[in-house]
């Protein structure tokens, strides 16, 4: 059965983190729904690149995915964190034991800020872990704690994406390894 991932974007998201993740998932035949958490599918990234999402979260808020991913970006994570629909969507996926994948500031500013880590280990960028009490910060590039996968930031985007892929495609590790080798990524 094909795995499905939702990528949650809001104005101000870190485009490099999002695009690398989406690319790796799609190379591995994982279905990706890029969902805008704003009122429109047209989004402006952290560095003012205009990107269109596939649809809005409001049209998919009752759907379940195998994983939910959030990139960083200061304003993007502020927008995600302040959106009650995003928090409810994440809570439903946590309760359903789905993968929650947070890159860069989203680990702290979305998950920890809304008490969604519940003591789990995670990593985040920029010293943001000092602002929130929820979760246990681990100073590593990528941290996996059960169904929670977090990465420090843009520089670890490939490692993060392949970590998520390996978790989702447990029966297809050779495919994941081949794709990593094919793009000259050592993991």
Language-model-detected regions and their locations in the chain:
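Short, solvent-exposed amphipathic alpha-helices that sit
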Residues: 17-27
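Short acidic-hydrophobic surface loop/beta-edge motif
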Residues: 41-45, 140-143
